[in-house]
UniProtKB/Swiss-Prot annotation:
Main location as per UniProt: membrane
Organism this protein belongs to: Mycolicibacterium paratuberculosis (strain ATCC BAA-968 / K-10)
Source taxon at top rank: Bacteria
Keywords: Cell membrane, Membrane, Transmembrane, Transmembrane helix
Transmembrane annotation, as ranges: 20-40, 60-80, 90-110, 130-150
Membrane topology: Multi-pass membrane protein
Protein name in the entry: UPF0719 transmembrane protein MAP_1032c
Protein family (similarity comment): Belongs to the UPF0719 family.
Length: 151
């Protein structure tokens, strides 16, 4: 007795196209995140890598982490709403992602001006400062609003 299962033909073309699209969206997303990292580095006192990874400043971690979460939400939303054509979708993700970097940068600059005391001192403090959570929530709100505006 034969027990055979008919598999049919397998078309890998859509899978390969999807894999290539995933790699390209990843590359664009990482490029936007790198631009975001350097923007945060420019807008916060000291070298961000040193403050986070060497000096272990908790306020720098909170602010930088919120910035990356907010920017990631914008990138994910841009990818989810991207155009059906890959080229247009990649350009859209890059444009919306960079808009997110700019808007989050504007929010950080506004907080520099509006936060009482020295924003720079808060970020560099070795003890966790409650103000860093307020800054983080504002950044998350800006990222959420920017993501919602992505069409």
């Amino acid at each position: 007795m034969y027990l055979a299962v008919e598999i049919g033909t397998v078309d890998l073309n859509p899978v390969l196209k999807g894999a290539v699209a995933t790699i390209l969206y990843f590359a664009v997303g990482m490029a936007v995140l790198l631009v975001g990292f350097y923007a945060v580095d420019l807008l916060t006192p000291g070298k961000l890598r040193q403050l986070v990874f060497i000096d272990r400043r908790p306020n720098a971690v909170v602010v930088a982490g919120a910035m990356y979460i907010a920017l990631t939400v914008v990138i994910i939303t841009a990818i989810a709403n991207s155009y059906s054509q890959l080229g247009q979708g990649l350009v859209g993700v890059a444009v919306y992602g960079l808009m997110g970097v700019i808007l989050l940068g504007v929010a950080l600059l506004a907080m520099h001006l509006l936060i009482p005391g020295s924003f720079h001192e808060h970020v560099e403090e070795p003890q966790l400062h409650p103000g860093s959570f307020a800054v983080a929530l504002i950044l998350l709100a800006v990222g959420g609003v920017t993501a919602a505006a992505v069409s």
